[in-house]
Amino acid sequence: MRDVNLELGGLLLDMAALAGNSQRAWGYKRAAKAVFRLDRHVTPLIEANTFKAVPGIGPTTDRIARELIYERKSALVEEAIRAAGKEEAIATLRRFRQHFISRATMEEVLARRGAPSRAKYRGDFQMHSIWSDGSETLDSVVEACLARGYQCAGMTDHSYGLPIASGMSMAQVVEQHAAIDELNAKYRGRFRMFKGIETNIRTDGTVDMEPHELRLFEFVVASPHSVLRKTIDQTSRMVGAVSQPGVCILGHPQGRRFNVRPGVAADWDQVFEAAAKREVAIEIDGSWDRQDVHYQLAARALDHGCIFALDSDAHSNPELNFVDIAIAHAKLAGIPQARIVNYWSEKTFLQWAQGAWDR
């Protein structure tokens, strides 16, 4: 699947990397952001000679776009790379951009008929509030979820083992759960917030909380937040995580970041096989710079019989929109709606999540 907007934005980031910390680098990054945010594909804009009217787009970006569309590569960019002697560095950055999708492609995919759909999506099961590294109160999150038509959601602030993300102490967990109980009473019949936690997967495959602590939550997400730039095999780490009692969602499994790092290196078929046996959901994290797992890996997970969670990983209310990216990846992967926990009833979700202690 070719995504010209993603390719073009990537070329602009290549030029920014070559320009260092200069004003030119800032300009290329601004143009790349404009391209990634476009809700239309660049090609018809170039053909209509209207691309330069997009805010942030200048003559050089227009030229690079024309070269990419008509020649399938940009001579201007390639010459700049050769002149700087940065072929290896740029090739590395390009690997960090594989299997992402732009907003334009997301909108195109979501417009296709068939499931999974935005309309029947019931609730998001990875999000963060002011209780850890998010910026919204619980009340604000509930109102934002209701505005999106959700019936439920799962709050998954960080665990205490990740202090860099202001992970919650167990005393704070007790306080937060009391606040969630109050909200659920207030919104009874309209909305339910589930008590979740995003735990950190240690290098040995265990998570950073004790079993008796994990049992306080209605569902547990386990995610990697360290050793995400190395090429060492971490299959045992990830298999260990999905094999741990109580864990029911493997969050942003690769831990990759767009144009920054590749994330965990693992035999993902082994990981997916282990997850399928325990009915641990593989997350498609829709955060723009994560998109993790991507549609190709998701399709492989589906072949192994996995179930899935499509989440935003929102740290502010506008970021709840990231779930649309996750849904688009799921559609590209051909995942049936019945295999996605975000479309299940509250009763079915809770039975499955609590069953993670016994499977």
Q: Language-model features: where?
A:
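Charged catalytic cores and adjacent phosphate/nucleic-acid-binding surfaces used
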Residues: 40, 80-121, 138-149, 160-191, ...
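Long, highly charged, low-complexity intrinsically disordered interaction regions
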Residues: 1-114
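Ser/Thr-glycine-rich phosphate-binding loops at phosphate-binding pockets of nucleotides
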Residues: 125-130, 152-156
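Active-site beta-strand->loop->alpha-helix modules in alpha/beta enzyme cores, enriched
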Residues: 197-200
